[in-house]
């Protein structure tokens, strides 16, 4: 490509753009390259480096303490669950690094440590899984176990879970093969009875059977655009051996199974006295969960065996919900304050208002998930009105707004403040 046009103006030797069409044109021996082509080259090199790193498995694995510290920034409480998760994730990706680049150990075969999260709705299961993917900078996909069925039946194929991860990786197979998949509502696919079923259970035990292979590690043949498979189409092959699977559920009633096991150890009158005097809370009982309890709940033994790391999340109390409102980096109140700041308005919450939000969410029994719903309802009118008003500088939410649906207090700008803003706007437009 020529480096000059008919008028003698210099051009990029690669894309052909003139020097007036680009910000910079850098000269070399007989050639020129523009800033846009340099950026493109850097992007290509960076992508290639990332791909090589993914293939070699040389990415740095954070220490368990570092993973927990990162989780602390986004998830309130659940200390024991965070530790369990941090150790399991650290060991999983150490194993991934060891298996990559021909480092397989001849004498010791390291198996996968997929993770089971047990906890009530809104206790932070999904957020923990999402945050783990963020700290590791790996692709993340989420699926709902209740929508899954065995292949060939109406519903979503189990392999579509892996397809979601591939799509989240922009169809980069190497990236996808080191990603994280979270399957929610796993307790809803428990089999109907503790004994093996003689009839077809396509959305319960059948889904557990179908999940076994991808949990342990298999090569999944995925249709590029999703949907049902047909013989004529080409498939993308994804190896699930190094994908970390985190599954979670509320497991309502599991505490009763554990209580029955732990209290039946003593027989006769003493057992009744002990049961009435020392009944433990649901969260404490769940922390004593054993594989046999999960089997009685309805998970098949083979499925339980693929989930060696179990983390139990406690229900959130009022104080924990209060912390969730204000403490995390992405706290809900901070998100709303950011939204209001786009309109030049400062949003404030009184201490009593925050407590009222926590109490209302607690009554709804939806955990942290209920906090946003309470605030959305309480602030609907003010969020509707504020963009149409240019003279409001502050909005104060008190407990009456939350409990009684009262209007929040609005603080208006003075005439001097409005004039100063108008003058500042004129200066910016003239500049």
Curated annotation (Swiss-Prot):
PROSITE patterns linked: CLPX_ZB
Listed GO MF terms: ATP binding; ATP hydrolysis activity; ATP-dependent protein folding chaperone; protein dimerization activity; unfolded protein binding; zinc ion binding
Binding site for Zn(2+): 12, 15, 34, 37
InterPro entries: AAA+_ATPase, ATP-dep_Clp_protease_ClpX, ATPase_AAA_core, Clp_ATPase_C, Clp_protease_ATP-bd_su_ClpX, ClpX_bact, P-loop_NTPase, Znf_CppX_C4
UniProt binding sites for ATP: 120-127
NCBIfam families: clpX, PRK05342.1
Name of this chain's protein: ATP-dependent Clp protease ATP-binding subunit ClpX
Organism: Bdellovibrio bacteriovorus (strain ATCC 15356 / DSM 50701 / NCIMB 9529 / HD100)
Lineage: Bacteria, Pseudomonadati, Bdellovibrionota, Bdellovibrionia, Bdellovibrionales
Protein encoded by which gene: clpX
């Amino acid at each position: 490509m020529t480096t000059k046009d008919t008028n003698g103006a210099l051009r990029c030797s690669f894309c052909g753009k003139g020097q007036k069409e680009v910000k910079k044109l850098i000269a070399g021996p007989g050639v020129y390259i523009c800033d846009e082509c340099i950026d493109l080259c850097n992007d290509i090199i960076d992508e290639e480096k990332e791909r090589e790193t993914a293939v070699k498995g040389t990415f740095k694995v954070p220490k368990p303490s570092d993973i927990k510290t990162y989780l602390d920034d986004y998830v309130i409480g659940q200390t024991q669950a965070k530790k369990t998760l941090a150790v399991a994730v650290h060991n999983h990706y150490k194993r991934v690094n060891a298996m990559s680049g021909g480092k397989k150990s001849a004498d010791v075969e390291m198996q996968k440590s997929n993770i089971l999260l047990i906890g009530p709705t809104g206790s932070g299961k999904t957020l923990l899984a999402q945050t783990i993917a963020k700290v590791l900078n790996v692709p993340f996909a989420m699926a709902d176990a209740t929508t899954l069925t065995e292949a060939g039946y109406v519903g979503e194929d189990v392999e579509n879970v892996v397809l979601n991860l591939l799509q989240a990786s922009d169809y980069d197979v190497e990236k996808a093969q080191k990603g994280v998949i979270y399957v929610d509502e796993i307790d809803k696919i428990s089999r109907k009875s503790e004994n093996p079923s003689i009839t077809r259970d396509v959305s319960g035990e059948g889904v557990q059977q179908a999940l076994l292979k991808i949990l342990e590690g298999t090569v999944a043949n995925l249709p590029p655009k999703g949907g049902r498979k047909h013989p004529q189409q080409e498939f993308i092959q994804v190896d699930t051996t190094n994908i970390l699977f985190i599954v979670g559920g509320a497991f309502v009633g599991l505490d009763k199974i554990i209580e029955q096991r732990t209290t039946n150890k003593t027989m006769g009158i003493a057992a009744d006295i002990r049961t009435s005097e020392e009944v433990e809370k649901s969260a404490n009982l769940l922390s004593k969960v054993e594989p046999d309890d999960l089997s009685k709940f309805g998970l098949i033994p083979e499925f339980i065996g693929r989930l060696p790391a179990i983390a139990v999340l406690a229900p959130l109390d009022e104080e924990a919900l209060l912390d969730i409102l204000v403490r995390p980096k992405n706290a809900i109140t901070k998100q709303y304050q950011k939204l209001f700041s786009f309109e030049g308005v400062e949003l404030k919450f009184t201490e009593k208002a925050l407590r009222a939000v926590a109490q209302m969410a607690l009554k709804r029994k939806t955990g942290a998930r209920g906090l946003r719903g309470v605030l959305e309802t309480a602030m609907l009118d003010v969020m509707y009105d504020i963009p149409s008003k240019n003279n409001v500088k502050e909005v104060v939410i008190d407990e009456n707004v939350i409990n009684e649906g009262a209007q929040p207090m609005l603080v208006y700008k003075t005439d001097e403040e409005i004039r100063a803003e108008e003058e500042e706007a004129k200066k910016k437009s003239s500049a």
